[in-house]
A protein has these predicted regions:
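Internal helix-loop-helix
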Residues: 42-105, 109, 113-114, 157-163, ...
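A short, Trp-centered hydrophobic/proline-enriched beta-strand micro-motif
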Residues: 114-122
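Glycine-rich phosphate/cofactor-binding loops in nucleotide/flavin-utilizing enzymes
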Residues: 2, 65-69, 90, 227-228, ...
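Glycine-rich phosphate/pyrophosphate-binding beta-alpha loops
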Residues: 127, 153-158, 201-202, 356-361
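Glycine-rich beta->alpha junctions and the first turn(s) of the following alpha-helix
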Residues: 3, 193-286, 357
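A structural signal for short hydrophobic beta-strand segments in well-ordered beta-sheet cores
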Residues: 136-139
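A short core secondary-structure module
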Residues: 145, 149-194
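Amphipathic, small/basic residue-rich leader segments at the start of a protein or domain
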Residues: 1-85, 106, 110-113, 270, ...
Length: 383
């Protein structure tokens, strides 16, 4: 299948633009994220990518090209960062594939209305890239209810989430990917669920640690002991239309870096100019690959290749951003002192954040192993 926009997509694009212009009337604060999700829900813009089996759960059905149009226009409008995307793009498709009818009816409409927010409980201090090393447990108590005990880390949006989908070990003594289950845990359990923000080197706290101390979990998706299958199915969803949205953001960042180079005169350096041109060309290539994959033309290793390209590209852009500014890119404002914190500028924030691009979501080393072992058929890495 080749990916190509349809003639009818022009009308849909205009509808999206008009709606966004009418509703993006004031800046959306972090506290307003929930309100914006509900606004999106009322507009019918949540769940566009859910498959046809989701009909009747409150979402609007859209073609693949319409999903891309929505994602592109949302990014171009500089609309607020989503706080409901984990439920919409990860949990909902997982429930459609593995959930019971009762689970779909309970959770999908609330996600489509923008009323319930989710976070993901996968990584642990000793199980990040090696997800099969999960130690969090879920055991039945005296009443037969499952209680979750353990720690998750790097959990985005945990402070705002109503629910967390958790990969936990339900078979005592099980090893690796055996004996795991996929559980849905309510976050509002004082004394049983604790969220601690993680301060990053950029000064922000986008990630959290989550501690479960006998937290109740009555919902299990995909059957007991089948958590690995469900978890891997969910991870495959983390690549797709959202990649195109990310690339539009990358293009805006690249434009700002180029403007800085022009304004400062750094663009007269032929080596730096060549690096900027290469960034532009590689971004165009990534977009083509993303559209090709969405059209069904990518091979089994396409998601891993895309992750490698994206992480390296963004990291190099961050390095360029501070290099272009020269010494000013490495120091704070004139009134900085060792005892007074200062706000990082845009280039510094970009540089510091992009150091993580080759790590989160599966490190470069993991992606190369996947390509080598699962696509090229090379021997497994010795352990």
């Amino acid at each position: 299948m080749d990916f190509a926009f349809e003639a009818t997509d022009d009308a849909f694009r205009q509808e999206v633009r008009s709606w966004l212009q009418a509703h993006l009337t004031q800046p959306c604060t972090a506290e307003g994220g929930r309100a914006w999700e509900r606004e999106l829900g009322r507009g019918g813009w949540i769940g566009l990518g859910w498959d046809s089996g989701a009909a009747g759960y409150g979402n609007r059905q859209a073609t693949l090209t319409q999903q891309v149009v929505w994602a592109e226009e949302y990014a171009r409008a500089h609309a607020p960062a989503r706080v409901g995307h984990i439920g919409e793009n990860l949990l909902a498709p997982t429930l459609l594939a593995y959930g019971t009818d009762a689970q779909k009816q309970r959770f999908l409409p609330a996600i489509a209305r923008g009323e319930e927010l989710w976070c993901q409980g996968y990584s642990e201090p000793g199980a990040g890239s090696d997800l099969a090393g999960v130690r969090t447990t879920a055991e039945r108590d005296g009443t037969g209810r499952r209680t979750v005990t353990g720690q998750k880390i790097w959990t985005s949006l945990a402070r705002d989430a109503d629910w967390c989908f958790v990969l936990a070990r339900t078979t005592p003594g099980s090893q690796r990917h055996h004996g795991l289950s996929f559980l849905l845990v309510p976050m509002d359990q004082p004394g049983r669920v604790e969220v601690r923000p993680i301060r990053q080197m950029s000064g922000t706290s986008e990630f959290n640690e989550v501690f479960f101390d006998g937290a109740f979990a009555e919902e299990l998706v995909g059957g007991e002991g089948n958590g690995w299958t469900v978890a891997m199915g969910l991870l495959a969803l983390e690549r797709g239309v959202s990649t195109l949205v990310q690339q539009i953001g990358f293009a805006a960042e690249l434009d700002r870096v180029v403007r800085t180079a022009v304004d400062s005169g750094a663009v007269t350096d032929p080596v730096l100019r060549e690096r900027l041109v290469r960034q532009w060309a590689e971004l165009k290539t990534m977009r083509w690959n993303a559209l090709r994959t969405l059209g069904g033309s990518g091979d089994a290793g396409a998601p891993s290749v895309a992750k490698l390209l994206r992480g390296g590209w963004h990291r190099r852009l961050g390095e360029l951003a501070v290099e272009i500014r020269g010494a000013a890119g490495a120091v704070g404002p004139d009134d900085w002192s060792p005892t007074t914190p200062y706000e990082l500028d845009e280039a510094q924030r970009l540089f510091l954040f992009t150091r993580s691009d080759t790590i989160y979501g599966g490190s470069d080393e993991i992606q190369r192993n996947i390509i080598a072992e699962r696509v090229l058929g090379l021997p497994r890495e010795p352990r």
